[in-house]
Amino acid sequence: MKKSTLTLGIIAALGAAWIGGAWYTGKVAEEEYVHQFELLNQNIQQSFSAKGLSVEVSQVAIERGLLSSKTRYDIVVKDPNKPESVFTLPFEGTLYHGPLPLNQLSQLNLVPTMFTSVDNLVQNDTTISWFKVAKGENPLSINTTMNYQRQGATKMHFAPVDISNEKDTWHLGKTNLTLDFTPQGIRQADMTVDKLVYQEADQKKRIQFNDIKAMAEYQPIKEWDLLSTGQQWIAAGETNIEETDEQGKTNLLTVKNWKIDLNTVRKEAFLDFAMNLKLEGTQLNQIHFGDLNLNMAFNHLDGEILNQVLHAKFAQTEDTPLTDAEIALLRKFFDKQPQFAFHPMLTTQAGKLAADIDVAVATSDLATLSRGKIFSLFHHFIFKVNSDKAALVEVASAAEQISEKVEKAQADRTAEMKVNDSLKTPIQQGILVDEGKHIKLDLVLENGELKLNGKVIPEEQVASILFLAAMSMGY
């Protein structure tokens, strides 16, 4: 037998096997394709139902072919309180059968895959306005890939749009959203937006975000339907907020970079929630204020009670006074001794301004307030301040330049004088401790005793102490 004949025979056999595999996989892929929509509906219903919206994928239809299938489906958005408000987003596309989908094979991608799909938004009465502002590009295209372990990703591409009316203009740049999923449903979402701009028609206000990125990873908690664990973050590059006042002066706030991190962890019947905010290169009218790093934590939150509180909140149709049952629920929540921590720090070229507040609630019995026993409400209470004097002067100088519109040299002299004057009395009274280039304050509840900088003080003096400390640090 000639080698060429043998080669052709092998190719033909492989081709037949591929086509046969694609035909068989097509049936399995179609079933899994529909199943993924069922899982998606469960995920989005859980997310939107508490917010008073109904969102679901419906009218899923498949026309099977040899190597691919034609698909159609609708995404329907309803407001249960407004039956006339129904928005239907129709999609059409192609489901490519594995194990080697045609669209992957054409790109020399030989990774075995159960299916890939490519779907595009279809123009109708609801979407026609979206097509117009997308300027010829399909407003929304969706690409999905799933492997034989039933894991994969859905990538959504939103075309840039410009939306204008009599009051304002919006520009949303190129946007991409990726949803990673497992057999249990969506587990992580990643989003990028190259630019978002808002501008008022009279041009008195303009806000621009550049290079927006976000990630959300979560695990639902079966017994607490409105809660989940996991990490989320959102970040952006240079952000500008420009506003013109009634006198015609334009103020420009610029943040070079910013990021917000969130993290929720379950510890048996309780949840710990943490947040971090970073603002880098903050300027107002080109006057530098430094970098802000803010850490917050809400720990030891009773999951069952918190879930009930959220249900009660979402059930409200308007702002109404708390019912007796809701007040009792909140008191029960605080009786579980939740903890709150707040740690801001501002870093400037001259130094740092830092504070620590750490409070754990002991009881919800507010009757102790009428007896003047404020700190009996707390399991522990910590309030600390640690600041560089030079940093205080630098921040005060920046505020002076903006409020009084003076040159930096004059603002520096005025700021130094005012800071020194404001610190004098609290230092003399022992509220603040002078450590040369630094000042500090330690107010700690320890073994039932309230200590200021290591010395026990009467509880009734706390309000005046905190007031004087705030006044001295405020400038």
Regions found by a protein language model. Name each.
Residues 5-9, 16-475:
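Glycine-rich, small/hydroxylated-residue low-complexity segments
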